[in-house]
Regions:
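Active-site histidine-anchored catalytic micro-motif
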Residues: 1-122
Length: 122
């Protein structure tokens, strides 16, 4: 079985943002030359996520609001994790909800998505 591994790095200027990385992943797939199989995309940072959904701004705002309602950033003291001196207890919980990775079928050298599906790093 052939495999290919490449790391992609993203700088996210805000505490929470959703970046469409579909083109980046597609570029890696093309570089790999793999025509059939599976493509695993995972976040290698403990408070980052990778997920598949629609690239629609209103939906992304809904996600941000919903996640903040589930695990508000403040008050920072509400999270036992933050006793370590960090302030990201909420981000760990949000990542758990959004997920660490996605797997996409590769068919004919292309990412095999359903309608509207895109890959996001958040």
């Amino acid at each position: 079985m052939r495999n290919f591994r490449k790391e992609l790095w993203f700088t996210i200027p805000q505490r929470m943002e959703f970046v469409n990385i579909t083109r980046d992943v597609d570029g890696c797939l093309k570089e790999s030359g793999i025509r059939e199989g599976l493509c695993l995309v995972n976040a290698m940072h403990i408070t980052a996520s990778v997920f598949i959904n629609d690239d629609e701004g209103g939906l992304h705002q809904d996600y941000a609001r919903w996640l903040e309602e589930l695990a508000p950033h403040e008050p920072i003291s509400r999270y036992l994790h933050n006793r370590t001196g960090e302030d990201n207890g909420d981000a760990h919980l949000k990542r758990q909800v959004m997920g660490r990775e996605v797997v996409v079928a590769v068919t004919g050298g292309k990412l095999d998505f359903g309608p509207w599906e895109q890959i996001f790093y958040g």
